[in-house]
Curated annotation (Swiss-Prot):
InterPro entries, per database record: ATP_synth_asu-like_sf, ATP_synth_asu_C, ATP_synth_asu_C_sf, ATP_synth_F1_a_nt-bd_dom, ATP_synth_F1_asu, ATPase_a/bsu_AS, ATPase_F1/V1/A1_a/bsu_N, ATPase_F1/V1/A1_a/bsu_N_sf
Site (described: Required for activity): 363
Protein name: ATP synthase subunit alpha
Entry function: Produces ATP from ADP in the presence of a proton gradient across the membrane. The alpha chain is a regulatory subunit.
Principal location listed in the UniProt entry: membrane
Enzyme Commission number(s) of this protein: 7.1.2.2
Pfam families: ATP-synt_ab, ATP-synt_ab_C, ATP-synt_ab_N
Entry binding sites for ATP: 170-177
Gene that encodes it: atpA
Catalytic activity entry: ATP + H2O + 4 H(+)(in) = ADP + phosphate + 5 H(+)(out)
Native organism: Pseudothermotoga lettingae (strain ATCC BAA-301 / DSM 14385 / NBRC 107922 / TMO) (Thermotoga lettingae)
Subunit (UniProt): F-type ATPases have 2 components, CF(1) - the catalytic core - and CF(0) - the membrane proton channel. CF(1) has five subunits: alpha(3), beta(3), gamma(1), delta(1), epsilon(1). CF(0) has three main subunits: a(1), b(2) and c(9-12). The alpha and beta chains form an alternating ring which encloses part of the gamma chain. CF(1) is attached to CF(0) by a central stalk formed by the gamma and epsilon chains, while a peripheral stalk is formed by the delta and b chains.
SUPFAM superfamilies: C-terminal domain of alpha and beta subunits of F1 ATP synthase, N-terminal domain of alpha and beta subunits of F1 ATP synthase, P-loop containing nucleoside triphosphate hydrolases
Cellular location(s): Cell inner membrane
Amino acid sequence: MRISPGEITKVLEDRIKEFKEEIDLQETGRVVQIGDGIARVYGLNSVMADELVEFVETGVKGLAFNLEEDNVGVILLGPYSQIKEGHIVKRLKKIIEVPVGEELLGRVVNPLGEPLDGLGPVEAKHTRKIEIKAPGVIYRRPVNTPLQTGIKAIDAMIPIGRGQRELIIGDRQTGKTAIAIDTIINQKGKGVYCIYVAIGQKTAAVARIVDKLREFGAMEYTTVVVASASDPAPIQYIAPYAGCAMGEYFMYNSKDALVVYDDLSKHAAAYRQLSLLLRRPPGREAYPGDIFYLHSRLLERAARLDDKMGGGSLTALPIVETQANDVSAYIPTNVISITDGQIYLEPGLFYSGFRPAINVGLSVSRVGGSAQIRAMKQVAGMLRIDLAQFRELETFAQFASELDPATRAQIVRGQHLQELLKQDQYSPLPVEEQVVVLYAGVRGYLDELPVESVRKFEKEFLDYMRTSKSSLLKLISEKKELTQEVEDELKKSIQEFLEGWHE
Protein backbone atom coordinates (compact mmCIF):
# COMPACT_ATOMS: atom_id res chain seq x y z
CA MET A 1 0.00 0.00 0.00
CA ARG A 2 1.45 3.34 -1.13
CA ILE A 3 0.56 6.71 0.43
CA SER A 4 0.93 9.71 -1.80
CA PRO A 5 2.87 12.77 -0.55
CA GLY A 6 -0.31 14.84 -1.05
CA GLU A 7 -2.22 12.75 1.54
CA ILE A 8 0.60 13.07 4.06
CA THR A 9 0.68 16.84 3.52
CA LYS A 10 -3.12 17.08 4.05
CA VAL A 11 -3.00 15.07 7.29
CA LEU A 12 -0.16 17.23 8.62
CA GLU A 13 -1.98 20.44 7.69
CA ASP A 14 -5.18 19.22 9.46
CA ARG A 15 -3.21 18.32 12.59
CA ILE A 16 -1.47 21.72 12.59
CA LYS A 17 -4.85 23.48 12.30
CA GLU A 18 -6.29 21.45 15.19
CA PHE A 19 -3.29 22.09 17.44
CA LYS A 20 -4.08 24.36 20.38
CA GLU A 21 -1.32 25.62 22.57
CA GLU A 22 -2.28 24.76 26.16
CA ILE A 23 -0.29 26.13 29.01
CA ASP A 24 -1.16 24.73 32.46
CA LEU A 25 -0.17 27.53 34.78
CA GLN A 26 -0.13 26.58 38.46
CA GLU A 27 1.02 28.64 41.38
CA THR A 28 3.29 26.51 43.51
CA GLY A 29 5.45 26.90 46.58
CA ARG A 30 8.02 24.82 48.44
CA VAL A 31 8.08 23.43 51.97
CA VAL A 32 10.72 25.20 54.07
CA GLN A 33 9.80 23.65 57.45
CA ILE A 34 7.61 20.73 58.55
CA GLY A 35 6.58 19.30 61.94
CA ASP A 36 3.72 18.90 64.46
CA GLY A 37 1.05 18.95 61.73
CA ILE A 38 2.26 22.37 60.49
CA ALA A 39 4.15 23.20 57.28
CA ARG A 40 5.80 26.52 56.44
CA VAL A 41 5.59 27.08 52.68
CA TYR A 42 7.59 29.64 50.67
CA GLY A 43 5.80 30.99 47.59
CA LEU A 44 2.00 30.77 47.06
CA ASN A 45 1.86 34.58 47.07
CA SER A 46 -1.79 34.71 45.91
CA VAL A 47 -3.17 31.99 48.21
CA MET A 48 -6.36 32.89 50.13
CA ALA A 49 -7.08 32.37 53.83
CA ASP A 50 -8.49 28.86 54.51
CA GLU A 51 -7.81 27.79 50.89
CA LEU A 52 -7.03 24.11 50.23
CA VAL A 53 -3.51 23.32 49.04
CA GLU A 54 -1.99 19.99 47.99
CA PHE A 55 1.46 18.56 48.67
CA VAL A 56 2.25 17.20 45.19
CA GLU A 57 4.65 14.37 46.13
CA THR A 58 2.38 12.81 48.78
CA GLY A 59 -1.15 13.93 47.78
CA VAL A 60 -1.80 15.16 51.36
CA LYS A 61 -4.03 18.22 51.55
CA GLY A 62 -3.70 21.20 53.88
CA LEU A 63 -5.35 24.51 54.77
CA ALA A 64 -3.63 27.87 54.31
CA PHE A 65 -4.03 29.04 57.91
CA ASN A 66 -1.44 31.79 58.43
CA LEU A 67 -0.71 34.27 55.64
CA GLU A 68 2.59 35.98 56.45
CA GLU A 69 4.91 38.31 54.51
CA ASP A 70 7.46 35.71 53.47
CA ASN A 71 5.67 32.36 53.96
CA VAL A 72 2.34 30.61 54.44
CA GLY A 73 1.53 28.53 57.56
CA VAL A 74 -0.33 25.42 56.36
CA ILE A 75 -2.16 23.02 58.71
CA LEU A 76 -2.07 19.45 57.40
CA LEU A 77 -5.21 17.33 57.01
CA GLY A 78 -3.38 14.02 56.67
CA PRO A 79 -0.20 12.14 57.65
CA TYR A 80 2.88 14.32 57.34
CA SER A 81 5.68 11.81 58.01
CA GLN A 82 6.47 11.51 54.26
CA ILE A 83 6.55 15.28 53.62
CA LYS A 84 10.08 16.69 53.37
CA GLU A 85 11.64 20.13 53.04
CA GLY A 86 11.70 21.21 49.39
CA HIS A 87 8.51 19.32 48.45
CA ILE A 88 6.22 21.21 46.06
CA VAL A 89 2.86 22.59 47.26
CA LYS A 90 0.20 23.74 44.79
CA ARG A 91 -2.96 25.82 45.21
CA LEU A 92 -6.32 24.11 44.65
CA LYS A 93 -8.26 27.42 44.49
CA LYS A 94 -11.18 26.14 46.57
CA ILE A 95 -12.39 26.04 50.17
CA ILE A 96 -12.59 22.67 51.93
CA GLU A 97 -15.90 20.83 51.33
CA VAL A 98 -17.43 17.73 52.91
CA PRO A 99 -19.96 15.23 51.53
CA VAL A 100 -23.50 15.83 52.86
CA GLY A 101 -26.94 14.29 52.47
CA GLU A 102 -29.03 11.31 53.54
CA GLU A 103 -26.34 8.91 52.27
CA LEU A 104 -24.33 9.75 55.41
CA LEU A 105 -27.10 8.62 57.79
CA GLY A 106 -26.10 5.50 59.71
CA ARG A 107 -22.41 6.09 58.95
CA VAL A 108 -19.34 6.86 61.08
CA VAL A 109 -17.03 9.25 59.21
CA ASN A 110 -14.03 11.47 59.85
CA PRO A 111 -14.32 15.28 59.45
CA LEU A 112 -13.35 14.94 55.75
CA GLY A 113 -16.35 12.65 55.16
CA GLU A 114 -14.20 9.51 54.77
CA PRO A 115 -15.78 6.34 56.26
CA LEU A 116 -14.41 4.84 59.49
CA ASP A 117 -17.00 2.06 59.91
CA GLY A 118 -15.82 -0.42 57.25
CA LEU A 119 -19.16 -0.26 55.40
CA GLY A 120 -17.69 0.84 52.07
CA PRO A 121 -17.37 4.30 50.50
CA VAL A 122 -19.85 7.11 51.20
CA GLU A 123 -21.83 7.62 47.96
CA ALA A 124 -22.93 11.20 48.67
CA LYS A 125 -24.42 13.22 45.79
CA HIS A 126 -23.83 16.64 47.38
CA THR A 127 -21.02 18.52 49.11
CA ARG A 128 -21.01 21.72 51.20
CA LYS A 129 -18.30 24.14 52.26
CA ILE A 130 -17.44 23.63 55.93
CA GLU A 131 -17.30 27.39 56.59
CA ILE A 132 -20.24 29.51 55.42
CA LYS A 133 -21.90 32.68 56.66
CA ALA A 134 -24.66 32.14 59.25
CA PRO A 135 -28.22 33.08 58.15
CA GLY A 136 -29.03 36.76 58.81
CA VAL A 137 -31.71 38.07 61.17
CA ILE A 138 -34.15 38.63 58.29
CA TYR A 139 -34.09 34.92 57.32
CA ARG A 140 -34.77 33.61 60.82
CA ARG A 141 -37.99 33.20 62.74
CA PRO A 142 -38.55 32.79 66.49
CA VAL A 143 -38.04 29.37 68.06
CA ASN A 144 -41.57 28.01 68.55
CA THR A 145 -41.46 24.22 68.03
CA PRO A 146 -40.24 21.95 70.84
CA LEU A 147 -37.32 19.56 70.51
CA GLN A 148 -38.19 16.93 73.12
CA THR A 149 -35.21 15.39 74.89
CA GLY A 150 -37.30 12.76 76.68
CA ILE A 151 -35.71 13.83 79.98
CA LYS A 152 -38.32 15.06 82.49
CA ALA A 153 -36.18 17.71 84.21
CA ILE A 154 -35.18 19.29 80.87
CA ASP A 155 -38.50 19.12 78.99
CA ALA A 156 -40.35 20.52 82.03
CA MET A 157 -38.02 23.24 83.32
CA ILE A 158 -35.29 23.89 80.72
CA PRO A 159 -37.21 23.28 77.46
CA ILE A 160 -35.31 23.25 74.17
CA GLY A 161 -36.83 24.48 70.90
CA ARG A 162 -35.88 23.60 67.33
CA GLY A 163 -33.26 26.10 66.17
CA GLN A 164 -31.95 26.81 69.68
CA ARG A 165 -28.33 26.58 70.97
CA GLU A 166 -28.39 24.98 74.43
CA LEU A 167 -25.09 24.40 76.22
CA ILE A 168 -24.54 21.26 78.34
CA ILE A 169 -21.86 22.13 80.90
CA GLY A 170 -20.29 20.33 83.85
CA ASP A 171 -17.22 18.53 85.19
CA ARG A 172 -15.93 15.34 83.61
CA GLN A 173 -17.98 12.19 84.28
CA THR A 174 -21.19 13.99 85.29
CA GLY A 175 -23.39 12.69 82.46
CA LYS A 176 -23.06 15.40 79.77
CA THR A 177 -22.75 12.98 76.85
CA ALA A 178 -25.55 10.82 78.33
CA ILE A 179 -28.02 13.73 78.02
CA ALA A 180 -27.00 14.31 74.39
CA ILE A 181 -27.29 10.60 73.49
CA ASP A 182 -30.71 10.30 75.20
CA THR A 183 -31.85 13.34 73.19
CA ILE A 184 -30.72 11.68 69.94
CA ILE A 185 -32.48 8.41 70.88
CA ASN A 186 -35.67 10.36 71.66
CA GLN A 187 -35.80 11.84 68.12
CA LYS A 188 -36.85 8.45 66.70
CA GLY A 189 -39.94 8.92 64.52
CA LYS A 190 -39.94 12.71 65.00
CA GLY A 191 -38.33 13.63 61.67
CA VAL A 192 -35.17 15.12 63.21
CA TYR A 193 -31.84 14.15 61.62
CA CYS A 194 -28.96 13.99 64.11
CA ILE A 195 -25.21 14.63 63.79
CA TYR A 196 -22.98 13.61 66.71
CA VAL A 197 -19.51 15.19 66.52
CA ALA A 198 -16.91 13.59 68.81
CA ILE A 199 -13.87 15.86 69.28
CA GLY A 200 -10.73 14.60 71.02
CA GLN A 201 -12.42 11.59 72.63
CA LYS A 202 -11.09 8.08 73.14
CA THR A 203 -11.96 5.84 70.17
CA ALA A 204 -13.27 3.15 72.56
CA ALA A 205 -15.73 5.64 74.12
CA VAL A 206 -17.03 6.65 70.67
CA ALA A 207 -17.40 2.96 69.69
CA ARG A 208 -19.57 2.39 72.80
CA ILE A 209 -21.77 5.37 71.85
CA VAL A 210 -22.19 4.07 68.28
CA ASP A 211 -23.15 0.61 69.64
CA LYS A 212 -25.80 2.18 71.90
CA LEU A 213 -27.22 4.27 69.04
CA ARG A 214 -27.42 1.10 66.89
CA GLU A 215 -29.04 -0.84 69.74
CA PHE A 216 -31.86 1.73 70.03
CA GLY A 217 -32.30 2.12 66.26
CA ALA A 218 -31.02 5.70 66.32
CA MET A 219 -28.27 5.25 63.70
CA GLU A 220 -30.99 5.20 61.00
CA TYR A 221 -31.25 8.99 61.28
CA THR A 222 -27.80 9.79 62.76
CA THR A 223 -24.33 10.52 61.38
CA VAL A 224 -21.33 10.23 63.73
CA VAL A 225 -18.33 12.45 62.92
CA VAL A 226 -15.17 11.38 64.77
CA ALA A 227 -11.96 13.34 65.35
CA SER A 228 -10.48 11.19 68.10
CA ALA A 229 -7.76 12.02 70.62
CA SER A 230 -5.20 10.30 68.36
CA ASP A 231 -6.07 12.50 65.36
CA PRO A 232 -3.89 15.55 64.66
CA ALA A 233 -5.04 18.98 65.90
CA PRO A 234 -6.05 20.23 62.39
CA ILE A 235 -8.56 17.36 62.03
CA GLN A 236 -10.00 18.12 65.51
CA TYR A 237 -10.18 21.80 64.56
CA ILE A 238 -12.33 21.26 61.43
CA ALA A 239 -14.57 18.54 62.98
CA PRO A 240 -17.40 20.75 64.37
CA TYR A 241 -17.54 22.84 61.17
CA ALA A 242 -17.83 19.65 59.10
CA GLY A 243 -20.62 18.32 61.36
CA CYS A 244 -22.40 21.67 61.15
CA ALA A 245 -22.24 21.59 57.31
CA MET A 246 -23.81 18.10 57.34
CA GLY A 247 -26.65 19.38 59.56
CA GLU A 248 -27.11 22.53 57.46
CA TYR A 249 -27.86 20.40 54.39
CA PHE A 250 -31.07 19.24 56.12
CA MET A 251 -31.91 22.74 57.43
CA TYR A 252 -31.65 24.32 53.96
CA ASN A 253 -33.79 21.48 52.55
CA SER A 254 -36.74 22.36 54.85
CA LYS A 255 -35.98 19.62 57.39
CA ASP A 256 -35.04 19.63 61.07
CA ALA A 257 -31.58 18.65 62.29
CA LEU A 258 -29.81 18.36 65.65
CA VAL A 259 -26.03 18.60 65.99
CA VAL A 260 -24.12 17.71 69.17
CA TYR A 261 -20.55 19.03 69.61
CA ASP A 262 -18.81 16.82 72.19
CA ASP A 263 -16.91 18.77 73.32
CA LEU A 264 -15.88 22.35 72.55
CA SER A 265 -13.26 22.48 75.35
CA LYS A 266 -11.12 19.98 73.40
CA HIS A 267 -11.87 21.89 70.19
CA ALA A 268 -10.55 25.10 71.79
CA ALA A 269 -7.45 23.23 73.01
CA ALA A 270 -6.77 21.95 69.45
CA TYR A 271 -7.11 25.50 68.09
CA ARG A 272 -4.80 26.81 70.83
CA GLN A 273 -2.21 24.19 69.86
CA LEU A 274 -2.35 25.21 66.18
CA SER A 275 -2.17 28.92 67.03
CA LEU A 276 0.83 28.52 69.33
CA LEU A 277 2.68 26.36 66.78
CA LEU A 278 2.04 29.06 64.18
CA ARG A 279 3.38 31.67 66.64
CA ARG A 280 0.15 33.63 66.95
CA PRO A 281 0.24 35.88 70.05
CA PRO A 282 -1.29 34.11 73.08
CA GLY A 283 -3.85 35.79 75.35
CA ARG A 284 -5.78 34.68 78.45
CA GLU A 285 -5.05 31.03 79.40
CA ALA A 286 -2.71 31.00 76.32
CA TYR A 287 -5.70 30.98 73.95
CA PRO A 288 -5.38 33.23 70.88
CA GLY A 289 -7.36 36.49 70.67
CA ASP A 290 -9.99 35.14 68.25
CA ILE A 291 -11.05 32.14 70.36
CA PHE A 292 -14.50 33.70 70.95
CA TYR A 293 -15.03 34.04 67.19
CA LEU A 294 -14.00 30.39 66.76
CA HIS A 295 -17.13 29.25 68.62
CA SER A 296 -19.51 32.13 67.82
CA ARG A 297 -19.23 31.61 64.05
CA LEU A 298 -19.95 27.91 64.57
CA LEU A 299 -22.93 28.27 66.92
CA GLU A 300 -24.52 31.19 65.02
CA ARG A 301 -25.14 28.76 62.15
CA ALA A 302 -27.85 27.06 64.23
CA ALA A 303 -31.18 28.69 63.39
CA ARG A 304 -34.87 28.29 62.68
CA LEU A 305 -35.36 29.57 59.13
CA ASP A 306 -38.47 31.46 58.04
CA ASP A 307 -40.90 30.02 55.46
CA LYS A 308 -39.31 31.91 52.55
CA MET A 309 -36.09 29.97 53.26
CA GLY A 310 -37.97 26.66 53.61
CA GLY A 311 -38.70 26.68 57.35
CA GLY A 312 -35.98 24.16 58.29
CA SER A 313 -34.05 24.23 61.56
CA LEU A 314 -30.67 23.32 63.01
CA THR A 315 -30.50 22.86 66.79
CA ALA A 316 -27.06 22.86 68.45
CA LEU A 317 -26.17 21.12 71.73
CA PRO A 318 -22.57 22.14 72.45
CA ILE A 319 -20.88 20.43 75.41
CA VAL A 320 -18.21 22.15 77.54
CA GLU A 321 -16.20 20.48 80.30
CA THR A 322 -15.39 22.52 83.42
CA GLN A 323 -12.52 21.99 85.86
CA ALA A 324 -13.54 21.73 89.53
CA ASN A 325 -16.95 23.35 88.88
CA ASP A 326 -15.33 26.56 87.60
CA VAL A 327 -17.99 28.02 85.28
CA SER A 328 -16.16 31.37 85.24
CA ALA A 329 -13.18 30.02 83.25
CA TYR A 330 -12.48 31.43 79.79
CA ILE A 331 -14.09 28.88 77.41
CA PRO A 332 -17.19 28.20 79.61
CA THR A 333 -18.01 31.94 79.93
CA ASN A 334 -17.47 32.43 76.19
CA VAL A 335 -19.83 29.63 75.19
CA ILE A 336 -22.42 30.57 77.86
CA SER A 337 -22.57 34.08 76.37
CA ILE A 338 -23.01 32.72 72.81
CA THR A 339 -25.71 30.14 73.55
CA ASP A 340 -29.43 30.51 74.37
CA GLY A 341 -29.13 28.88 77.78
CA GLN A 342 -27.27 26.13 79.61
CA ILE A 343 -27.93 22.83 81.35
CA TYR A 344 -25.57 22.77 84.34
CA LEU A 345 -24.56 19.35 85.73
CA GLU A 346 -23.15 19.12 89.23
CA PRO A 347 -20.82 16.40 90.54
CA GLY A 348 -22.37 16.64 94.04
CA LEU A 349 -25.80 15.72 92.70
CA PHE A 350 -24.34 13.00 90.47
CA TYR A 351 -22.50 11.26 93.31
CA SER A 352 -25.49 11.53 95.65
CA GLY A 353 -27.50 9.45 93.15
CA PHE A 354 -29.54 12.29 91.62
CA ARG A 355 -29.24 11.50 87.91
CA PRO A 356 -29.42 13.27 85.49
CA ALA A 357 -27.41 15.57 87.82
CA ILE A 358 -29.05 18.79 86.60
CA ASN A 359 -28.83 21.79 88.91
CA VAL A 360 -32.22 23.30 88.06
CA GLY A 361 -31.40 26.55 89.87
CA LEU A 362 -28.34 27.34 87.73
CA SER A 363 -29.73 25.94 84.46
CA VAL A 364 -31.78 28.13 82.15
CA SER A 365 -33.34 28.11 78.69
CA ARG A 366 -33.65 31.64 77.36
CA VAL A 367 -35.87 30.96 74.33
CA GLY A 368 -37.24 27.43 74.80
CA GLY A 369 -40.24 28.50 76.93
CA SER A 370 -42.18 29.65 73.87
CA ALA A 371 -41.60 26.24 72.25
CA GLN A 372 -43.00 24.23 75.18
CA ILE A 373 -46.36 22.53 74.62
CA ARG A 374 -49.22 23.95 76.68
CA ALA A 375 -49.83 20.75 78.66
CA MET A 376 -46.24 20.77 79.91
CA LYS A 377 -46.43 24.50 80.71
CA GLN A 378 -49.49 23.87 82.89
CA VAL A 379 -47.58 21.25 84.89
CA ALA A 380 -44.07 22.77 84.82
CA GLY A 381 -45.09 26.16 86.26
CA MET A 382 -46.15 24.55 89.54
CA LEU A 383 -43.16 22.18 89.49
CA ARG A 384 -40.72 25.09 89.25
CA ILE A 385 -42.37 26.97 92.15
CA ASP A 386 -42.53 23.86 94.37
CA LEU A 387 -38.85 23.04 93.77
CA ALA A 388 -37.74 26.66 94.34
CA GLN A 389 -39.59 26.74 97.68
CA PHE A 390 -38.13 23.36 98.60
CA ARG A 391 -34.57 24.56 97.89
CA GLU A 392 -35.09 27.51 100.23
CA LEU A 393 -36.44 25.29 102.99
CA GLU A 394 -34.10 22.32 102.42
CA THR A 395 -31.62 23.48 105.05
CA PHE A 396 -34.39 23.32 107.66
CA ALA A 397 -35.33 19.74 106.69
CA GLN A 398 -33.10 18.32 109.44
CA PHE A 399 -35.29 20.09 112.04
CA ALA A 400 -38.46 18.67 110.46
CA SER A 401 -40.12 17.81 113.77
CA GLU A 402 -40.05 21.46 114.93
CA LEU A 403 -41.52 22.93 111.70
CA ASP A 404 -45.13 24.02 111.23
CA PRO A 405 -47.35 21.69 109.14
CA ALA A 406 -47.36 23.95 106.02
CA THR A 407 -43.54 24.10 105.87
CA ARG A 408 -43.30 20.36 106.53
CA ALA A 409 -45.75 19.72 103.68
CA GLN A 410 -43.66 21.85 101.30
CA ILE A 411 -40.49 19.94 102.21
CA VAL A 412 -42.25 16.59 101.71
CA ARG A 413 -43.62 17.73 98.32
CA GLY A 414 -40.13 18.88 97.25
CA GLN A 415 -38.50 15.59 98.27
CA HIS A 416 -41.08 13.62 96.27
CA LEU A 417 -40.70 15.85 93.20
CA GLN A 418 -36.90 15.56 93.32
CA GLU A 419 -37.24 11.78 93.40
CA LEU A 420 -39.70 11.96 90.51
CA LEU A 421 -37.19 13.88 88.36
CA LYS A 422 -34.63 11.07 88.58
CA GLN A 423 -34.37 9.08 85.36
CA ASP A 424 -32.30 6.17 84.11
CA GLN A 425 -29.98 6.53 81.13
CA TYR A 426 -31.27 5.37 77.70
CA SER A 427 -34.90 5.62 78.83
CA PRO A 428 -36.31 8.87 77.39
CA LEU A 429 -40.07 9.34 77.91
CA PRO A 430 -42.63 10.67 75.39
CA VAL A 431 -43.92 14.10 76.42
CA GLU A 432 -47.47 12.88 77.21
CA GLU A 433 -46.07 10.31 79.70
CA GLN A 434 -43.93 13.01 81.32
CA VAL A 435 -47.03 15.22 81.69
CA VAL A 436 -49.14 12.57 83.48
CA VAL A 437 -46.32 11.58 85.86
CA LEU A 438 -45.41 15.18 86.76
CA TYR A 439 -49.11 16.04 87.14
CA ALA A 440 -49.41 13.33 89.81
CA GLY A 441 -46.39 14.85 91.59
CA VAL A 442 -47.34 18.55 91.54
CA ARG A 443 -50.99 17.84 92.50
CA GLY A 444 -49.86 16.10 95.69
CA TYR A 445 -50.96 12.55 94.85
CA LEU A 446 -47.54 11.23 95.89
CA ASP A 447 -47.18 13.19 99.14
CA GLU A 448 -48.47 10.30 101.26
CA LEU A 449 -46.11 7.75 99.69
CA PRO A 450 -42.66 7.00 101.15
CA VAL A 451 -40.00 8.81 99.06
CA GLU A 452 -38.30 5.51 98.17
CA SER A 453 -41.56 4.25 96.54
CA VAL A 454 -41.83 7.16 94.07
CA ARG A 455 -39.77 5.49 91.29
CA LYS A 456 -41.77 2.26 91.69
CA PHE A 457 -45.02 4.26 91.49
CA GLU A 458 -43.82 6.01 88.33
CA LYS A 459 -42.92 2.76 86.55
CA GLU A 460 -46.12 0.94 87.44
CA PHE A 461 -48.38 3.97 86.87
CA LEU A 462 -46.94 4.43 83.36
CA ASP A 463 -47.47 0.70 82.63
CA TYR A 464 -51.09 1.11 83.77
CA MET A 465 -51.58 4.23 81.60
CA ARG A 466 -50.06 2.54 78.52
CA THR A 467 -52.26 -0.55 78.85
CA SER A 468 -55.55 0.71 80.32
CA LYS A 469 -55.60 4.44 79.45
CA SER A 470 -53.70 4.65 76.15
CA SER A 471 -56.57 6.71 74.66
CA LEU A 472 -55.98 9.41 77.33
CA LEU A 473 -52.24 9.54 76.53
CA LYS A 474 -53.12 9.80 72.83
CA LEU A 475 -55.55 12.65 73.58
CA ILE A 476 -52.86 14.62 75.50
CA SER A 477 -50.40 14.00 72.65
CA GLU A 478 -52.87 15.30 70.03
CA LYS A 479 -54.42 18.24 71.93
CA LYS A 480 -51.12 19.26 73.54
CA GLU A 481 -52.98 20.80 76.49
CA LEU A 482 -54.80 19.73 79.63
CA THR A 483 -58.39 20.79 78.98
CA GLN A 484 -60.87 20.49 81.87
CA GLU A 485 -62.21 17.25 80.40
CA VAL A 486 -58.70 15.74 80.02
CA GLU A 487 -57.70 16.89 83.52
CA ASP A 488 -60.80 15.30 85.10
CA GLU A 489 -60.08 12.04 83.28
CA LEU A 490 -56.44 12.15 84.41
CA LYS A 491 -57.39 12.76 88.08
CA LYS A 492 -59.79 9.82 87.90
CA SER A 493 -57.08 7.58 86.39
CA ILE A 494 -54.54 8.48 89.12
CA GLN A 495 -57.10 7.85 91.89
CA GLU A 496 -58.17 4.52 90.36
CA PHE A 497 -54.54 3.40 90.10
CA LEU A 498 -53.66 4.46 93.67
CA GLU A 499 -56.69 2.61 95.09
CA GLY A 500 -55.49 -0.70 93.69
CA TRP A 501 -51.75 -0.05 94.09
CA HIS A 502 -49.62 -1.68 96.77
CA GLU A 503 -46.25 -0.24 97.70
